[in-house]
Amino acid sequence: MNEGKTQDNEEKYGLIQAFKLLVKNKYYMMICGTYILQQLYSAMIGAGLFYMTWVLKNKNLFGWFAWAVNIPLIIALIFTPTLVGKWKGMYKLNMRGYMLAVIGRALVVVAGYIGNVPLMLVFTAVAALGQGPWQGDMNAMIASCSEYTYLTQGKHVDGTMYSCTSLGVKIGGGIGTAVVGWLMELSGYVGKNTTQPQSALDMMQFMYLWLPLIFDVLILVILSKMNVEAENERIKLQRGIGSDIRHEI
């Protein structure tokens, strides 16, 4: 019944008004920015096929690196709810997770330059394990952002906010695909050639080793400012509102 009430309230908003409500929520903008960076990260990891083929000279390694990403992510997703409870919220978990991810990707860079593939696989898995909690609690974070909009502006935007978060995915995915193509073209890469110029090989290293690390650092910076749970509690305490407000609205 409360859910129907929320939907009715949201239906009264025009597209422009809903957009203004979302833009005024700094935490929502942070989530969108993080989504875009995640998609750019994924695009560079996907471009790893070029790196495996031309730098490591074994395109079959791409499948192994895919496993090194996916298995730790699944493990992290399983344990995320427990860790959220243990650390009393998502902020600390997300921060610690991405600190681990940054360390992992930094060590991937080191292992890449010394040419140690087993170490690259291990540190890729470490980075993925650190990224998992954020992927596991994203929806809960969006719910907290929606609560922040209600607390600060008195408006329900739950449905709109969930729908619009796909914006970051679409924008990031489109930009990521385009950037991969542009960078490879600028480097002088020609797919039909049996050999590639050094400029292309250097670009492949930059795209697969350095850009994912840079994107993880940027995401960590954003997450360090995304303590929306604490902000919501501060506002509710200031106004004398119960902590179970989400169940009442």
Residue ranges and their predicted role:
Residues W54-P72, L119, S199-M207:
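Loop-to-transmembrane helix entry
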Residues W182-I214:
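A membrane-interface helix-boundary motif in multi-pass transporters
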Residues M99-G115:
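C-terminal ends and interior cores of transmembrane alpha-helices
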Residues M1-K59, M204-M207, P212-I249:
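Intracellular loop-helix junctions on the cytosolic face of multi-pass helical membrane proteins
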Residues V110-T124, W134-A140:
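Helix-loop junctions at membrane interfaces in 12-TM secondary transporters
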Residues N70-I78, G174:
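Residue-level signature of mid-helix packing/kink "hotspots" within the transmembrane helices
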Residues I75-K92:
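Helix-to-loop junctions at the C-terminal end of transmembrane segments
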Residues Q153-G188:
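A late C-terminal transmembrane helix in Major Facilitator Superfamily
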